[in-house]
């Protein structure tokens, strides 16, 4: 099945799960206008993305089972995949409010839609609650039910911790590079992105396939957290050095005072004179300041540093993958598939 067909099939499953929520609301006599609002919120905030996280649940489950999924198995994996997408949507609704963002996936952010405003705060909670409704409906009788609940709660908490540190370290309206460090960047990336984007989908598939032993989960986490960190460092690099005609966006990390890998590496390597330039220009909303920051990055050979980082990190990831014991039910191809998708990517 092509990537386009996989995406379309996954997308076609969402109305089934939304209908389950809507039908439940009818049984408890929730007014139609509330039900319709909730339904619109669920569709608006979950559709239109790449679905990488949700599809990773299905792909990983199929690899673990070792054969194509029948319809029942597919829907079991798909509902977990959509729970990951709901979690992502919950985070993004709140992120967009906190960041005062204007658009998301090519349309206005939910809080900017007509009549929404601050109601979006409650809508974010409602989107999160849909996860646990679907989890109970589809997995209440499964032996892994409590493990799945705990996994979602743990990863949500981890992501929120990462977001908290990011917000306190790099507020857009208050630049203080003394708060930045590579150690903080690593924590933010691992907690804010890697756990829910890389570890969660695979861990869900492992529970579904019955191979989620403590040893297997630790092995998967060790690999996937490094993969997730590498992915975010790539993102930071592409924001500064990517081709906008390929990435589809013009980078704004320097203007927005982002605690990115690039600025943290620059701070670790720079001379006192270069540090003054970075302090005076980073996070300033003008193109001349941005140019001065980029000039320092060039002097520090950030491009070359990234290439060295990439090769070192990928070598470490491959070593960890080679060490996976497949006799326990875990499969190396889960991780090689992830790595293949992101190695040397340009967007």
Swiss-Prot record:
Mg(2+) 2 binds at residues 95, 99. Dimethylallyl diphosphate binds at residues 104, 192-193, 232, 249, 258. Farnesyl pyrophosphate synthase; part of the second module of ergosterol biosynthesis pathway that includes the middle steps of the pathway. Fps1 catalyzes the sequential condensation of isopentenyl pyrophosphate with dimethylallyl pyrophosphate, and then with the resultant geranylpyrophosphate to the ultimate product farnesyl pyrophosphate. The second module is carried out in the vacuole and involves the formation of farnesyl diphosphate, which is also an important intermediate in the biosynthesis of ubiquinone, dolichol, heme and prenylated proteins. This is Farnesyl pyrophosphate synthase. Pfam families: polyprenyl_synt (PF00348). Its main location: cytoplasm. GO terms for cellular component: cytoplasm; cytosol; endoplasmic reticulum; nucleus. GO terms for molecular function: (2E,6E)-farnesyl diphosphate synthase activity; dimethylallyltranstransferase activity; metal ion binding. Mg(2+) 1 binds at residues 95, 99. SUPFAM superfamilies: Terpenoid synthases. Coiled coil: none annotated. Binds 2 Mg(2+) ions per subunit. It is found in: Cytoplasm; Nucleus. InterPro entries: FPS1-like, Isoprenoid_synthase_dom_sf, Polyprenyl_synt, Polyprenyl_synt_CS. It catalyses: isopentenyl diphosphate + dimethylallyl diphosphate = (2E)-geranyl diphosphate + diphosphate; isopentenyl diphosphate + (2E)-geranyl diphosphate = (2E,6E)-farnesyl diphosphate + diphosphate.
């Amino acid at each position: 099945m092509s990537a386009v067909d996989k995406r379309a099939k996954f997308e076609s499953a969402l109305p089934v799960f939304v209908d389950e929520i809507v039908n439940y609301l009818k049984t408890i006599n929730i007014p139609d206008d509330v039900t319709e609002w909730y339904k619109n919120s669920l569709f608006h905030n979950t559709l239109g993305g790449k679905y990488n996280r949700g599809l990773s649940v299905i792909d990983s489950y199929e690899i673990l089972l070792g054969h194509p999924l029948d319809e029942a198995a597919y829907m079991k994996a798909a509902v977990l995949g959509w729970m990951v997408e709901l979690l992502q949507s919950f985070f993004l609704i709140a992120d967009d409010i906190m960041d005062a963002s204007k658009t998301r996936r090519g349309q206005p952010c939910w809080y900017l839609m007509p009549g929404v405003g601050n109601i979006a705060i409650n809508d974010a909670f409602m989107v999160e609650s849909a996860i646990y409704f679907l989890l109970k409906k589809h997995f209440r009788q499964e032996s892994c039910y409590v493990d799945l609940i705990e996994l979602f709660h743990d990863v949500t908490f981890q992501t929120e911790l990462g977001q908290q540190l990011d917000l306190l370290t790099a507020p857009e309206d208050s630049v203080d590079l003394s708060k930045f460090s590579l150690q903080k960047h690593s924590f933010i990336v691992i907690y804010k992105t890697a756990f829910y984007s890389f570890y969660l989908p695979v861990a869900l598939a492992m529970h579904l396939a019955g191979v989620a032993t403590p040893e297997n989960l630790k092995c998967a986490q060790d690999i996937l957290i490094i993969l997730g960190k590498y992915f975010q460092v790539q993102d930071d690099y592409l924001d500064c050095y990517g081709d906008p005609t390929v990435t589809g966006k013009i980078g704004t990390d320097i203007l927005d005072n982002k605690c990115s890998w690039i600025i943290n590496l620059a701070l670790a390597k720079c001379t006192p004179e270069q540090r003054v330039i970075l302090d005076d220009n980073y996070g300033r909303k003008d193109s001349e300041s941005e140019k001065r920051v980029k000039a320092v990055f060039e002097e520090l050979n950030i491009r070359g540093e990234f290439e060295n980082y990439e090769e070192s990190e990928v070598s470490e990831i491959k070593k960890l993958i080679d060490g996976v014991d497949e006799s326990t039910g875990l499969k190396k191809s889960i991780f090689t598939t992830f790595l293949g998708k992101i190695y040397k990517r340009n967007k």
